[in-house]
């Protein structure tokens, strides 16, 4: 966790894949003990339903309120890295696959399953240590998304902190976080593909200003 950010001066993807590579080496060294990274439960219907409900709540809170306010105060998000997917079905499908493999699974495995869990255990492994770890790793996660602009980085930090606090209550169920992350990003990419947020942002801005 301390070394990986240094690669950010080269390329942000190098930072991510270096950390992910280290995490997988540790996983291999533990004889693939997935429970060490918080993956101690299988996917169940209850977990899927719970993830869908949480995703819906997060979408309402963030897209309708948090995102609207941040963009009004700090400027719009820089989504140029994914704007090519607009109206592009092939690009949309490819990006969906990438999202579920590298964003949903990869980022949750690395940031929550490895960074947050390992740091919390290093600090003392009590509830306060887990919360402190959630804040620290979420700051790191937010900064790693600075390419989305200041408003984007702040939004990602707040979203990551929320997700991390959920993980604190479900320390043996990282699958729940993976599903939430995947569903949430899928909604966002679908909206970009359709070039529409169905009037939600305009309605929210009028409501909040």
Question: Residue ranges of each PLM-predicted region?
Answer:
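Juxtamembrane/transmembrane-helix boundary motifs at the membrane-water interface
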Residues: 2-11, 75, 193-204
């Amino acid at each position: 966790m301390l070394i990986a950010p240094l690669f950010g001066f080269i390329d942000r993807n190098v930072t991510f894949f270096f950390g992910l590579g280290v995490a997988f080496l540790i996983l291999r060294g533990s004889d693939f003990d997935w429970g060490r990274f918080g993956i101690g439960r299988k996917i169940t219907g209850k977990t899927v339903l719970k993830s869908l409900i949480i995703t819906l709540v997060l979408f309402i809170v963030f897209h309708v309120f948090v995102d609207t306010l941040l963009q009004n105060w700090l400027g719009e998000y820089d989504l140029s890295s994914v704007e090519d997917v607009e109206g592009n079905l092939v690009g949309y499908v490819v990006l969906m696959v990438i999202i579920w493999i590298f964003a949903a699974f990869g980022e949750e495995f690395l940031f929550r399953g490895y960074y947050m869990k390992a740091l919390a255990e290093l600090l003392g492994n009590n509830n306060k240590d887990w919360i402190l770890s959630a804040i620290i790793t979420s700051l790191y996660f937010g900064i790693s998304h600075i390419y989305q602009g200041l408003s984007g980085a702040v939004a990602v930090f707040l979203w990551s902190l929320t997700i991390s606090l959920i993980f604190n209550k479900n320390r043996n169920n990282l699958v729940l976080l993976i599903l939430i992350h995947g569903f949430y990003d899928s909604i966002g990419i679908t909206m970009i593909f359709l070039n529409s947020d169905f009037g939600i942002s305009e309605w929210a801005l009028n409501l909040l200003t």
